[in-house]
Amino acid sequence: MTRRQGGFTLIEVLVALVLMAAGLALAFAMLRSSTAVAARGEDMAQASERMRAVHGYLRARLTSAQPIVFATDRGTLRQARFIGTPQRMRFVTDLPDYLGHGGPYLHDVVADGEGRLLVGFSVAQPEASLDDLEQRAAAQRPERLVDGLRAVRFHYRGLDADNRLGPWQDRWETSEMLPLQVKVEVEAVRGGRWPDLVVTLTRSEGGAGGGLLPGGSNPVLP
């Protein structure tokens, strides 16, 4: 009986086993790689969807913000229609239909320092003091818009003395009026920094949406 008639030699069997093991290892490596790529793709898709949802909500609420008084400073009698700080903004806008019966409500949007962006809702009460406002906010159970954030900052701007868009500010000092624009900066723990969201408030006293400034002059936008 020849060698070929007697079957494979031990060396040939070992070589075949080594090649088979290498092939299986390569197949498993490719499977793990494709699974990791698919998981990363799914994570990116979820992060993108979350970003679009949050941006869409904030854009809709800010665009329709109304110059309705929701608090009055008892000392100066200044009426608040928009209060904005780096991590918080309060304004009146319509409540989404899916959250209730609609209509104008005070919205309290806040980055809570724990990686969450929250929003609280309450009935606007023009006679309420600023202290009343804080007490009501402390008693609220706000809704969570999104979590897993590293940083959130709000910026505001209106028209300058030359009737042009002024610089971005970390605080909106003219609480009696709506800002002309609001910018939202967000950096997520996973996914990095989101594109900046810039929203024009169409009912701003700054003249957005074709309105006129007091005295009849039109704003000059760049």
Report each predicted region and the residues it spans.
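Intrinsically disordered, low-complexity regions enriched in Pro/Ser/Thr/Gly and acidic residues
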Residues: 97-180, 207-209, 219-222
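A cross-taxa feature marking solvent-exposed loop/turn segments within ectodomains of secreted
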Residues: 102, 192-194
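Extracytoplasmic/luminal low-complexity segments enriched in Pro/Gly and acidic/polar residues
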Residues: 194, 198-222
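Solvent-exposed loop and beta-edge segments used for protein-protein assembly and interaction
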Residues: 83-85, 176-178, 191
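Beta-strand-rich extracellular modules
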Residues: 187-189
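Extracytoplasmic beta-strand-rich oligomerization domains located immediately C-terminal to a leader/signal peptide
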Residues: 30, 35-128
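N-terminal single-pass transmembrane signal-anchor helix
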Residues: 2-34
